[in-house]
Structure formats: C-alpha cells, structure tokens
Amino acid sequence: MGLTKEYDVIVVGAGHAGIEAALAAARKGMRTACFTTTLENIGAMNCNPSIGGPAKGHLVREIDALGGQMALTADATFLQMRLLNSGKGPAVQALRAQIDKRAYAWAMRLVLERTPNLDLKQAMVQEIVVEDGRVRGIVTATGIFYGAKAVVLSTGTYLHGRTIIGEVQRSSGPGGLAPAVGLTESLKRLGFEVGRFKTGTPPRVDGRTVDFSRMVRQDGDPEPHRFSFMSPLDHREQLPCWLTHTTPASHELIRRNLHRAPMFTGVIEGRGPRYCPSVEDKVVRFADKESHQVFLEPESRESHEMYVLGLSTSLPEEVQIELVRTVPGMEEAELMRPGYAIEYDYIVSTQLKPSLETKLVRGLFCGGQINGTSGYEEAAAQGLIAGINAACYVEGREPLVISRSEGYIGVLIDDLVTKGSPEPYRMLTSRAEFRMMLRQDNAHLRLTEKGREYGLVDDARWEVFVALRDGIEAERERLARTVVGPAPEVQRVLERLGSAPLKAGVTLEQLLRRPEVRYEHLVEMGLGRPDLDEAIWREVETQVKYAGYIAKEQQQVDRMRRMEARRIPPTLDYQALTGLSMEAREKLSRIRPETLGQASRISGVSPADVAVLMVHLDRLARARDRAEEA
C-alpha cells in the first residue's frame, strides 16, 4: 500500500455536509480532497426537493453568514419561495424554497470543480488510518492510501445502508446507489460506538397523470425572497405545489396491509425520525383522524416527476400504487419511483467535541447524518463547522465553536455533543432558548464577523455586510436622537392607525415602539427615510419593537456565558467527587464536558451536581493561585 498523494484535509462524502466541509477547507487554503462513491451524485437531494422552513431556514442563513455555499445555490436554483409564519413574530418566521434538485446538484458540482485547492475523487473509502492517536489518512476499496493531516467523515445514510420495500431488502444507499461497506468496521476497530437509524422517502409520481383540478394550488410569494444577502432578488416564474389529502379508503388499505409493512413486522430495527413519520405510522398512531395532508411538489423544471410529501412509506410497491390512487387527484397516477425505508449506521454523537472533532482520534471530524441528524440543512451546517475546524486543526489554531446564544448551529451541535439523540435529530425553533436573538433575519449580523475571522468571508461579502451593519447602527442612532412633536401630518397618520395622538415631543424610536406604528408609517409622516434599504429598515424596526424581549434574553445569555467560561479540566476524575450522584458521575465521565455550562445541560446532571462541580472548580482555582504565588 503506497502513498498516492498527501493532503491537508480529506473529506469523505459529497452530500450536503461533505460539500460544505470540502469548500470550507479548500477556501481556507488547505490542499483538500473530497471522496464520493459516484461523482454524478454530488449534492443529491435524495429526499424532499426543498430547503429551509422553521429552524432549518435559520440554519441556511447562518451557513451563508459564515461563508458557506448552500444559500447561494438554493437562491440560484429555486422553483418556488415562501416566507412561512409571516403573520407571526420575527423569531419564528422562516424562508422555505422548493428546489430544482437536478439544477442544484449540478450547480454544486460546478462550484466544487472550480474551487482552487480542491480535488474530487470517485472512490469508496473503507478505512481510516490512525497512528499514535492521530488520523493519518484513508484507504480506498481498491487499496489506495491517501495521506491527510485531518479527515472529515460526512457519509450521510450510506454506512451499511439497507433499503426496504415491503418484503424486498437489499444492501443499498439512497436512490439505489452502492452502500459504504467497510468504514463502519474501521470505526469500530478504533473504539467508536456505532448505532443504527432509519429514515424513509415517499413515492414519486408522473405529474402528467395527476388531476390537479382536484387539489388546492399553492403558489410562492409574489414578492421575491432570498436566503443569501449576496444573491440578487429574482422575479423568475415560480412553479406551484399542490395540496390534497388521504382518505378513509387510504387508511383502510394501509390497515389491511400492516402485516406486510416492514415498520410493523420487525424487519426494520433502526429508530426513525419522530417529526417525519411514515404514512402507515401516522394511520396507526392517529387512528381517529380521517385524513392526513399530502403535498405534491415539483422536483425539477426539466422533469414531470412529483414528490408526494406526506406519503413516506416502505409498503410493498403494489400496495403503494393502490395507496396513491386513493388520494384525490391521483386516481390514475403512475408511480415513477416507489417509496422506501433505509437503515444506516451512525456514530453516537456524544463521542464528539463541540468542534466536531472526535474525542478518540485527533484530527478526525464528523459532520452530517453520520452524527445522527436528519435533514439537508442540519448536515450542511455541521459540514461547514467540521471543515473549518479540520483546517484550524491543520493550522494549529483554536477551533470555531458557535455557542447556543450565537446561532442555531450552536444549539444543534451542543445538543448533539452534550445530550446525543435516540432518534434522527431535527432542528426545531423550540430547541433554541434565545429565539428573539437568533432570528433568521439577523444571521448575518450575528455570524459574518466570525466567518471573516476564520477566512471564509471574502472582501465583496464583507463590504456588503459592513454597509448593512453600519446602516442599521446609523438609523438606530437617528431614531434615538430625533424628537418629533404633535405635528398635523403625524397626528393624521396616528389617528388613522387608531393610535393615541401625541401630546408632547417623543423620539422616533419611542414612536416606532408603538405596536400599530411601522417604519413605513414614519416615511408617510415624513420622518422616515424612503431611500433606505429594506433590509436595514426591517432590522431596525425589529430591534426597536422587541428591545425589551431582547434585553431579557441578553441577561440570560450573560448568565450562560459565565457558566461557559468555567472550564473543566479534561482529566478530572468525576468518580472521586463524592458529592455527585451516581448517574452524574457516569454521564460526566462518559461525555466529559468542556465547560460547566455544557455539564449543566447533560441529562441526569442535576443543579445539585452542578453546584458540587462549581465548588470543586473553585477549590482547584484557589489551589492554582496559591501555587503561582509560591
């Protein structure tokens, strides 16, 4: 086994995590190689043809702010965009786009091929080579060794993949591609704990065989949206989605065939995603419901293939055909692909550091579904952080760690490395403690400076960001210092809005704080700036109106940061701390949190246990101070 080539960073996998990892490392100047089992499958969207949505849209915006690629490519290839929860507060509003999955995958491949310092390799990686506790490289199925100072594993659902359709099972990755064989055994030999999860996908139908007149049309928003503030606003023609529903006949058919459903026959052993259940699971769990929503989503401008969201299933193909035809509008639908379930191996995520480096092997990082997550956006976010930190490892630089108070990416990774997950992890807005501070509309304000610090934000992006940031600050200052009195044009607008008239002078900031007053009303009064960029005035309006809530969250953040500042020695013997509960000793010894804050979030570690740890850390600090004085 000879050395073929030496790289700084090797990325295994070219899905959504692998793409971001490879681009991040290469853009930071690392000699990078990205391995995939087939070059034709780079950036494949093997499940739903969409990006974004609640919490997921936040992740996409944060990836963009840090200098990642997903947002830019989504903006370039979308079929439809909608702002979800637009009638609710800004904390839960989220952008969701239907994506042309063919165009998206091709665009991502072009980005990779045109990136300096990045080689693409079609090969099956079977072994991780480790020497003296450090990663040394990888070996392919054909016996070729490639050296590397850091390796990122982003294998998706390919590790020992097994697809199931009714009674038919076969070793396979998603979409019928070859599974990754051998890598799981390599990880186990290195001492990693490996688990098994399951996910699934619905059938696809030929749109020419669907009667859309029996469905409810759902169009994109007429006003243009974008994930990246670097993308132009695009008024392209959008394609509609369609809403229909299952029927009592659908449910009866499923019940009659439960004895053939792998979910209920014991064929499927892996735990599936809670928030994306199969249709047979929904029928059993919600037996009183007469129907469930079904959405038909276009997959590409170049294809008639439609994704049947809501009918994820692993029932036999002949049952799937019959099932689809019980849904209004699809009585004569032709299946182009059957739905299937897929089982795959993953690494138990508590074996990772917050940097996504493994605790067992230095220089080995993991990102994406290999860490037990679900979703393109979750994968891309982890891949980006893993790629940045693989490069930092090579440079000998401190890793980038996003805290829970800085981004949804921080919440995602902290949950994984601190708590783990007994099922495929999905990002939800409810998982974030500081939702008013972590809005999707301020992701660039929160994280672009970090992206610049770590070398992924170029001069063009930085210039646009600085203009936005400075524009927001300048307008906030103007609103705070400008006083307006009860002028007739002001009183007229306030009366029309049903707002109390002014009796004395107030600042524009105080006026904008009124629930019924919007920034455009200030413009109408002659007090706003009609030429101001919409992104600036919208952010200013949000900051002013929610200042009280944001201030309360900031107090919580300050308390959390004090806890995060208390570092725990990596060699601390928890078994020797007699004040800890037995469960806390076991969990702390296994997870080995890096800070007191992380320790406090571990399931089974009580406030009393945290107090014991705090006392011990204080004792260690005093002993260290005395030693230094001596």
Curated annotation (Swiss-Prot):
Its main location: cytoplasm. Its cofactor is FAD. Belongs to the MnmG family. Transmembrane segments: none annotated. GO terms for molecular function: flavin adenine dinucleotide binding. This is tRNA uridine 5-carboxymethylaminomethyl modification enzyme MnmG. It comes from the Bacteria. NAD-binding protein involved in the addition of a carboxymethylaminomethyl (cmnm) group at the wobble position (U34) of certain tRNAs, forming tRNA-cmnm(5)s(2)U34. The keyword tRNA processing applies. The lineage of its organism: Bacteria, Bacillati, Bacillota, Clostridia, Eubacteriales. Homodimer. Heterotetramer of two MnmE and two MnmG subunits. NAD(+) binds at residues 272-286. SMART domains: GIDA_assoc_3. Keywords: Cytoplasm, FAD, Flavoprotein, NAD, tRNA processing. It is found in: Cytoplasm. GO terms for cellular component: cytosol. One of its GO terms (biological process) is tRNA methylation. FAD binds at G13, A14, G15, H16, A17, G18.
